[in-house]
Design a protein with these regions (language model features):
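Local beta-strand N-terminus motif with an aromatic residue
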Residues: 41-43, 99, 141, 180
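Conserved beta-strand elements of the Class I
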Residues: 45-46, 101-103, 144
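Active-site segments that bind and position negatively charged phosphate/pyrophosphate groups
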Residues: 212-268
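N-terminal small/polar loop signature for handling phosphorylated ligands or for N-terminal nucleophile
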Residues: 53-128, 239-250
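A glycine/threonine-rich phosphate-anchoring loop and its flanking beta-alpha core
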Residues: 20, 122-220
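An N-terminal, well-structured beta->alpha segment
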Residues: 1-75
Length: 268
């Protein structure tokens, strides 16, 4: 072990947070019912946004749930930069329909909204009560996060960003309990992303990797993830932008953004 490593990390306790299970690969979303049942979920609230509904991705997932005879309720009101009111509305739907688990479908907004529901439904109170670090004290409902963009890494992080409309600020909630139980990164769900969104989300992943790599909280594990993420982004992002139907490039970006998420999630 190098003297540099000893000076940086020896004698320190570091942590590494990731979902219990992660599935990456073409059509892995077909495993959602099995994974949900394994967690004990019988009636999930499906949290998504109008864009995911309009492009047909929600139907792809609900068809899978229907085929497996899984009862569910849909909340499609997630908005960009989800608000406390957004979380309140979704939580009411969750409780009114006696849901017992969560499935989020989309990018960061859908995942953050679902995480907000998990906090309030599982612990009570208001979402504002959980601003800060590890403020919850009860387990989250079983939670499957289905990613549709190769960018934020929200499907696997312990971060939840919710806008407080009264204070007009974004609340940063960092809590290991909101890490999804299962993360799904199915490149087939990303084939329809336009070039502009593919590029923007890819740069988001690159930013996460670079920030993690230069962080003072970086560890050998986060460095390894960040380095591989940057390598894959360099290899696959331009291909995915040029041809959205390039399955190898889409799958490569799934790995890239997940690796970047692992780095960022644990070096912040």
């Amino acid at each position: 072990m190098s003297s540099e490593l000893k000076s940086m990390h020896m004698g320190q306790v570091t942590s590494f947070f990731i979902p219990n299970v992660t599935l990456v690969g073409q059509h892995c979303s077909k495993e959602i019912p099995n994974r949900l049942k394994a967690l004990g979920g019988k009636h999930p609230l499906v949290v998504t946004d109008k864009g995911i509904v309009a492009c047909g991705i929600l139907k792809q997932i609900t068809d899978i749930l229907d085929e497996a005879k899984v009862a569910y309720t849909v909340f499609d009101g997630a908005v960009p930069n989800p608000t406390d009111k957004n979380v309140e509305d979704a939580t009411k739907v969750y409780l009114d329909n006696k849901c017992d688990s969560l499935i989020s479908i989309g990018g960061g907004s859908s995942h953050d909204c679902a995480k907000g529901v998990g906090f309030v439904a599982g612990n009570g109170g208001r979402i504002q009560d959980y601003e800060g670090v590890d403020k919850s004290n009860k387990p989250f409902p079983p939670y499957v996060a289905v990613n549709t963009t190769a960018g934020t890494g929200s499907e696997m992080t312990r971060f939840c960003i919710i806008t407080d409309t009264a204070r007009k600020v974004k609340m940063a909630i960092i809590d290991w309990r909101c890490t999804p139980s299962v993360a799904i990164d199915d490149p087939v769900l990303m084939m329809g992303m336009p070039p502009s969104l593919t590029a923007a989300t890819g740069m988001d992943a690159l930013t996460h990797a670079v920030e993690a790599y230069v962080s003072t909280a970086a560890t050998p594990m986060t460095d390894a993830c960040a380095e591989k993420a940057m390598e894959y982004i360099n290899r696959y992002l331009r291909r995915a932008v040029a041809d959205g139907s390039d399955k190898e490039a889409r799958e490569g970006m799934c790995y890239a953004e997940y690796l970047a998420g692992m780095a960022f999630n644990n070096a912040s």
